[in-house]
Amino acid sequence: MTRGSTSQSVLSSVRDLLPEVAAAAAEVDRTGVVDRAVITLLHDAGYFALLQPPDFGGLDADPDIYLTATRELSSACMSTGWLAGWLAVNNWGLSVRDVRVLREIWGADPRALLCSSYAPTGRLERVPGGFRLSGRWARCTGAPYASWLSVAALKVGADGAAQDFMAVLVPRGDYTVQPTWNGLGLRGIGADDVIVTDTFVPEYRAFSWLDMVPDAALPALQRLPQPTLYTLAGTMPLLGAAHRALHAASDAHVTARADVELSMMQIRRNVAEQLDCVRGERYPDAELMLRTRRDQVMAADRALRAVEVVVDDAGIEPDEPLLERIWRDVQTARMHVASNVEQVLTVVGRHSVGIAVDDLIW
């Protein structure tokens, strides 16, 4: 990224990389590795700076630029788009944390990347000056590419009972990456397990997930509700893969194309409305949050169905490795919690008839 780069110039630079990314997709699938040189090229293009805070070299971009770039990367190679999208959104998640940890991470290395898992499979115990952390987290996308880890853990009291749901930041030297990822698809995302054993975590690196409220002085991008971009990070790759499959299809598949286009329109509308809320110093209400989550999960489902329609019509033949790979990738991506259609629509339905709902799905 050059001085004076804009978010639109970043999108243009990412598009320039797409032929190279697409040409490498079969090799990524075969070896299970996205070349680190591609990550460097995405850094150079400014992709990972899109969601970084301005005080640390970020661009404070319109989130639609990030969503579009991630979708187009995924159209070229879904493993690359999924990996890059999650590494980038973790930059955004970090941006609302204590400024001391931002300085610790990006002050030392402006290109530092984080992997994450927010399944609360860790245990935090209070000690002087902070906590002791132990745990194991499965399927942390990008673990081999990251120099920091962001994970969820339950803070427990002296009696062992859970007291809080915390997010914790851990440097690379304090955790172990166990190479376990061997998915049916998305083979290049490096979603390995990470292990932390009785590691000290300073107070400023641990945050209450339930009580976290972004500073009103932060840019609007950083004040978007946390679930919004995190769930979309799991959906843009599916939409990108669907676009590629439809483009490769010999038939028109008009309905499937319309469904994918509709999904992008709904996503853009919802994110724009959330931005309007935070710019007006209002938190998006339950109606908007649930509609955003509904449309996001339906977009994931429509993308999956679009790929299945193409594959069902064409069949998966030995001379169609592209469709075969895309099919495996989307079947793997659908397993992510962000794409749990039944859970989300059940909650939306309960809310629509006046039943109280658990807002953690937001």
Where are the predicted features?
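Glycine-rich beta->alpha junctions and the first turn(s) of the following alpha-helix
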Residues: 183-265
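Glycine-rich flavin
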Residues: 34-44, 48-146, 163
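C-terminal helix-coil-helix/basic helical segment that borders enzyme active sites and/or dimer interfaces
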Residues: 22, 26-30, 262-301, 308-318
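A short core secondary-structure module
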Residues: 139-177
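Glycine-rich phosphate/cofactor-binding loops in nucleotide/flavin-utilizing enzymes
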Residues: 314-362
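Amphipathic alpha-helices that form helix-helix packing interfaces
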Residues: 17, 235, 242-245, 249, ...
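Generic N-terminal amphipathic, Lys/Arg-enriched alpha-helix
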Residues: 2-4, 17-25
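Amphipathic, non-membrane alpha-helical segments in soluble helical-bundle scaffolds
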Residues: 7-11, 32-36, 228-239, 253-264, ...
